[in-house]
């Protein structure tokens, strides 16, 4: 051997040995049918690793292989721990994947050395929404080299996000390329808006706004790492001239998301607003982001106020704010911006609004009665709160919140009304009770601040009857003011009819079907409509998914509710409000015609992006009467006395030998009314852009039409 090569060979050998010595050491990857030598206590972790999402859990991703630790076993209220056998610390870093809830004291992965916790990590999610994805994190443990240690996964948390996901725990000498933590950017507020880049489907980041060092609001944001799909708008006009700091909890090393945020004098959404291809033209939807339940519907200062569950920073559910829009005619709406933002009590869940005409709350000013919002703050605990305004634009949360403490974790959605005979406020509140299931609690108050339980109405076991978002109101039967009944309904619009003495509701008819369609949920009615008007007007959440857009979901058209006598007792009727007639651009009619099978389409020349069709007919010898609106099919089956709306069936009996049908068609769905409003069938549907046709057809005989009219409609925008 050449002596000159010996040092080189020795160096090569030592280097090779060093590389081998530095190979990663897997502590646990949670594959297989058991936890092995790890010791579990309690119920949260079960007896073996999970293989992904557990029942009732959002999709879990980002874990390694087929298994992971998931403490959602038996839901968020289960607790327990999972402890590893002892191991020697032999590498500089301890790397792991972690996700789930964020609670530094009750929900964490712990490293213990000499029996003491020396490192701890928790998940990213604090409030409703968020993501179950696991992300890479690590600790520098070089100071403990050679010492014995154990790992302990602790779940002592209950309620929302009361669980942790952990996987792939590894010792390594290579620092993992984990995300940057608590990344900040300072901004001097000079313009009224911040534009935040959003990428639909991107991992959610926790974005927190601080003003002069004080935390203002935090949101889960699908922050675009590069080119955004759209821009969310944050109004910062209240803090002009102040020092703002934006903080993101985790960011990939290469993400530009925080750098892309910029100030502007006008919202970035002033571009093609309301002209987007899937924007409903007769259904309200927010400028940007997600909406669900209508909230706080009230008539105040000569305006209809529509508040709604809103995520201004994402296309999907989360970050619950109260959005706000107003209208003078129930048809044309102006969105004003969010009025209730998440706070230390939690995200802003559903509720109602009233005008406190007598200023019982003391929240009025200079003789102006306050509008009072009553809402659920869905933190831990989940409580009921109020906010007020004397101008219908600026709202102040009550300093004495909450006005009603948590009963159970499943209490929410207060609907409040004034009960004139007892001179008290009445609240109906959804409460999920152990062993009793869905209930509605009735509370009374002299001032909207102090509430006393008056009674409880039970739902029906193993059903969704009276599940969440209750509404409660009085209506005359057949318009007769001396024959009035109270209606209690839940989110799916099933309802009860009965009497109310100011404290207790006594149902005479229970679990009656409301709407008969699909994609309709959490309807609410307006309070404080003028006495000379006297209508009970309802709007529901219309579940119209609009993929590829910067907004998602919408509201139904406003509906007038009445109680009508039937052989089975009083029943609700649903009819579109008369104000919608103002949208008619032109009238096409074929009144008085008898149509036979094979006759030409009387509306073959009609075209419309949004359309209204009305028909009253005697079916005669016809087997079916068929309406086509922008490619959707509405069939009346004469023998079955049944309506079939794009394949969805609903009972529709003749009334005095006749049938009446009204159809509203839009870019995102249909709303169909039959039987003088006793049958209401909403149905999300997306027509082809080029199909703007209307067609009426008779199968197997003839039908006589007393009324047959089609109206192309103007846009509400």
Task: Please give the residue ranges for each predicted region.
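Surface loop/turn signatures of beta-propeller and other carbohydrate-active proteins
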Residues: 119-131, 175-178, 215-231, 256-295, ...
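Extended extracellular/luminal ectodomain segments enriched in beta-structured repeat modules
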Residues: 77-79, 87-95, 146-148, 188-195, ...
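Hydrophobic core segments of beta-strands in well-ordered, beta-rich domains
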Residues: 96-97, 152-153, 196, 246-247, ...
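Short beta-strands within extracellular/lumenal beta-sheet-rich domains
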Residues: 66-93, 104, 135-137, 178-188
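Extracellular glycan-recognition surfaces and repeat-rich motifs
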Residues: 34-68
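Extracellular carbohydrate-recognition regions
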Residues: 22-48, 175-176, 587-590
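Extracellular carbohydrate recognition and processing domains
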Residues: 112-163, 179, 197, 202, ...
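Beta-rich accessory regions
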Residues: 181-183, 187-197, 203-213, 240, ...
């Amino acid at each position: 051997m050449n002596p000159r090569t010996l040092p080189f060979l020795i160096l090569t050998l030592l280097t090779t040995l060093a590389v081998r010595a530095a190979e990663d050491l897997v502590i646990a990857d949670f594959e297989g049918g058991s936890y092995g030598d790890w010791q579990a206590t309690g119920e949260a972790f079960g007896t073996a690793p999970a293989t992904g999402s557990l029942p009732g859990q959002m999709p879990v991703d980002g874990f390694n292989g087929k298994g992971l630790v998931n403490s959602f076993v038996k839901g968020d209220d289960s607790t327990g721990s999972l402890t590893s056998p002892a191991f020697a610390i032999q590498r500089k870093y301890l790397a792991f994947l972690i996700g789930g809830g964020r609670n530094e004291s009750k929900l964490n992965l712990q490293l213990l050395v000499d029996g003491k916790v020396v490192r701890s990590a928790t998940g990213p999610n604090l409030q409703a929404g968020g993501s179950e994805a696991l992300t890479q994190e690590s600790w520098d443990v070089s100071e403990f080299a050679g010492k014995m240690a154990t790992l302990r996964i602790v779940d002592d948390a209950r309620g929302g996000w009361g669980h942790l996901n952990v996987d792939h725990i590894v010792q390594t000498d290579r620092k993992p390329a984990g995300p940057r933590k608590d990344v900040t950017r300072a901004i001097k507020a000079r313009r009224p808006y911040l534009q935040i880049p959003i990428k639909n489907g991107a991992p959610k980041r926790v974005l927190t706004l601080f003003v002069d060092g004080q935390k203002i609001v935090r949101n889960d944001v699908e922050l675009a790492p590069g080119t955004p799909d759209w821009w969310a708008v944050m109004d910062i006009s209240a803090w002009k001239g102040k020092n703002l700091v934006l903080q993101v909890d985790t960011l990939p090393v290469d993400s530009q998301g925080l750098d892309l945020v910029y100030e502007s004098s006008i919202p970035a959404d002033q571009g093609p607003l309301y002209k987007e291809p899937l924007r409903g033209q007769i259904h309200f939807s927010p400028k940007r982001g997600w909406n669900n339940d209508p909230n706080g519907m009230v008539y105040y200062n000569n305006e209809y106020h529509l508040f709604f569950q809103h995520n201004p920073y994402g296309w999907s559910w989360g970050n619950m704010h109260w959005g706000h829009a107003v209208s003078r005619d129930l048809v044309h709406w102006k969105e004003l911006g969010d009025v209730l933002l998440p706070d230390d009590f939690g995200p802003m869940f559903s509720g109602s609004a009233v005008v406190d005409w007598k200023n019982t709350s003391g929240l009025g000013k200079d003789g102006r009665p306050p509008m009072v919002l009553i809402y659920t703050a869905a933190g831990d605990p989940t409580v009921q709160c109020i906010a007020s305004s004397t101008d219908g634009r600026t709202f102040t949360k009550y300093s004495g919140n909450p006005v009603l403490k948590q009963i159970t974790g499943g209490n929410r959605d207060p609907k409040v009304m004034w009960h004139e005979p007892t001179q008290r406020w009445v609240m109906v509140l959804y409460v999920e009770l152990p062993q009793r299931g869905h209930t509605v609690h009735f509370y009374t108050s002299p001032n909207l601040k102090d509430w006393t339980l008056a009674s409880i109405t039970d739902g029906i076991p193993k059903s969704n009857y009276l599940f969440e978002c209750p509404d409660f109101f009085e209506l005359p039967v057949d318009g007769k003011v001396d024959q009035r009944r109270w209606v209690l309904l839940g989110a799916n619009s099933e309802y009860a009819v009965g009497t109310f003495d100011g404290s207790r509701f006594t149902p005479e008819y229970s679990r009656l079907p409301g709407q008969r369609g699909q994609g309709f949920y959490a309807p609410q009615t307006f309070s404080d409509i003028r006495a000379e008007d006297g209508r009970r007007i309802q709007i529901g959440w219309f579940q119209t998914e609009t993929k590829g857009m910067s907004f998602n979901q919408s509201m139904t058209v406003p509906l007038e509710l009445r109680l009508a006598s039937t052989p089975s007792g009083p029943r609700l009727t649903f009819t579109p409000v008369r104000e919608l007639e103002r949208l008619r651009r032109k009238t096409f009619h074929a009144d008085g015609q008898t149509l036979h099978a094979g006759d030409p389409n009387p509306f073959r020349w009609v075209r419309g992006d949004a359309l209204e069709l009305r028909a009253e007919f005697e079916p005669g010898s016809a087997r079916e009467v068929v309406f086509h609106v922008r490619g959707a099919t509405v069939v009346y089956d004469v023998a079955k006395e049944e309506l079939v709306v794009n394949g969805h069936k609903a009972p529709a009996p003749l009334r005095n030998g006749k049938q009446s049908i009204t159809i509203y068609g839009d870019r995102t769905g249909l709303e169909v009314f039959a039987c003088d409003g006793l049958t209401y069938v909403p149905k999300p549907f997306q027509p082809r852009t080029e199909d703007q046709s209307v067609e009426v057809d008779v199968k197997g005989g003839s039908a006589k039409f007393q009324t047959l009219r089609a109206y192309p409609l103007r846009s509400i925008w």
